[in-house]
Regions:
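Structural signature of tandem alpha-helical TPR/SEL1-like repeats
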Residues: 128, 273-278, 308-314, 343-351, ...
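Alpha-solenoid helical repeat scaffolds
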Residues: 51, 95, 134, 248, ...
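Residue-level recognition of tetratricopeptide repeat
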Residues: 35, 70, 116, 301-302, ...
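Canonical tetratricopeptide repeat
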Residues: 66-68, 113, 298, 335, ...
């Protein structure tokens, strides 16, 4: 129901509402009256004429639903004695809005609004709220774009599991669906940002583009918050002590299900359970029925766990080569860059990170990996202490880039950049060195240069 619209009622011509007027000639007049009151937030005065239109001419104009939501929310907050009645009315308004005006409202958005209403005013059970959101998500996940509702959906499911009403496997399946949705939204957000970032840096954005970029980044930050909250809500349910018995129990029945094997192996790998014999069974079963980028990646994890990094990297590279989706390939290259960095293979790590960025410029994590690589190379670059510490400016600059292209990494990127800048030459160092505004070339594996800031 929340639409960024501005309604301007000038003259409600009789011809516009001829059919309805013939049925009830008072409707157009009351529409005009309640709209004028609602525009100036005089919701009490708007209520009676609005209700007359809503009850008698529900298909007259979409403004009945647009302003009706505001009017009823005001009544809910200002008239506690009749709150339940107004909540019921607002619920019904959500349920009929998309039926009467399908071009303006959709069922998914209306179901989300209904669930949030029931939750916010504590008038629905966990089961009721979950069922509404589950219907909305499963019927049309593409339209499910409300971060708060995504968290509520998963949170209520975990609560129902804790109450013994939902199976753990359903929690994991929904976690995969919800986090997958967040990843899709973050990718879309990142791609939008990449379109504008060069103009932003050049200072040539139009006011409309500035607003678009600000809104997109805010949405990215919202997804960052709920992503962390969803992981926290899952908590210990996804540790090895829960995962291993569950997957052992289901293995024989589902060992021919490639999607289940991918999910199970992926979760065990991410939670540090790759040392368990079950992980071997999962990976081998997956590679047997569907040799793929995923199966090769998990075989790499298997050899990593066994300490055979050479063979592990062979499988990781096979995984990258087999992957056809550019975003997924970029993610695998990012993982490879991180693993190479952890092993001190800096040049290889940089290569993988840069390849990931070429495939997916909207990814922020490769920039954080590069920033960390630069910061860990201070003693390798430069002939003086000042030049060596100057690498931290490059690290900070690179870390900030991560937050610019990927709002979900904003706080992490800002923290990393601040840490690196804290190790760079101080204001007094810059002054005493006489290097302010000069360029330092990095004649080491890092390459490139940095302009010394005039602090």
């Amino acid at each position: 129901m929340k639409k960024n619209v501005s309604i301007l009622f000038c003259v409600l011509g009789a011809a516009l509402f001829s059919v309805v007027s013939a049925q009830n000639p008072e409707c157009p007049q009351n529409l005009s009256i309640f709209a004028e009151h609602a525009k100036v937030k005089n919701y009490d005065a708007a209520y009676e004429p609005w209700k007359m239109v809503y009850d008698n001419c529900p298909t007259l104009h979409w403004a009945t639903y647009h302003y009706g939501e505001r009017i009823l929310k005001h009544k809910i907050d200002s008239d506690p004695a009749n709150k339940a009645e107004y909540v019921k009315m607002l619920t019904e308004l959500y349920e009929t809005s998309f039926k009467n005006f399908p071009d303006r409202y959709n069922e998914t958005g209306s179901l989300i609004d209904k669930a949030l209403l029931l939750n916010d005013y504590k008038l629905g059970t966990d089961e009721e709220i979950y069922q509404v959101l589950d219907q909305a998500f499963k019927n049309n996940p593409e339209e499910f774009k409300n971060p708060k509702a995504l968290y509520l959906y998963f949170s209520k499911l975990v609560d129902l599991h804790d109450a013994g009403k939902k199976e753990l496997q359903e929690v994991f399946d929904t976690y995969d669906d919800v986090t997958g949705k967040i990843a899709e939204e973050n990718q879309e957000i990142g791609e939008t940002i990449v379109k504008y970032i060069e103009k932003e840096e050049a200072g040539t954005l139009t006011s409309k583009e500035e607003k678009t970029l600000a809104a997109v980044r805010q949405n990215g930050e919202n997804y960052e918050k709920i992503s962390g909250s969803i992981d926290a809500k899952l908590g210990k349910l996804a540790d090895c002590t829960n995962l291993i018995p569950l997957y052992q129990k289901n293995f024989e029945a589902r060992k021919g299900d490639a999607d289940w094997l991918k999910s199970a192996a992926g979760r065990m790998d991410s939670k540090g359970c790759a040392g368990d014999p079950l992980f071997v069974k999962l990976v081998e079963a997956l590679d047997e029925i569907e040799p793929s980028a995923s199966s090769k990646y998990y075989l790499g994890s298997l050899y990593d766990e066994q300490g055979n990094s050479t063979k592990a990297f062979d499988f990781y590279k096979q995984s990258v080569d087999l992957e056809t989706d550019p975003v997924k390939k970029a993610q695998k290259l990012t993982n490879l860059a991180n693993k190479a960095s952890q092993r001190g293979r800096k040049s290889s790590a940089r290569q993988y990170a840069n390849e990931a960025l070429q495939l997916n410029p909207a990814g922020g994590t490769p920039y954080l990996i590069l920033a960390n690589l630069y910061a860990n190379s201070a003693n390798e670059c430069g002939s003086t202490a000042f030049e060596k510490r100057a690498i931290y400016w490059k690290a900070a600059q690179t870390a900030r880039r991560a937050g610019q292209v990927d709002p979900s990494l904003k706080s992490r990127a800002a923290s990393a950049a601040a840490s690196y800048e804290g190790r760079a030459p101080s204001k007094s160092d810059v002054f005493s060195s006489g290097m302010a505004g000069k360029t330092i070339e990095f004649n080491c594996w890092v390459g490139g240069s940095i302009k010394v800031p005039s602090l």
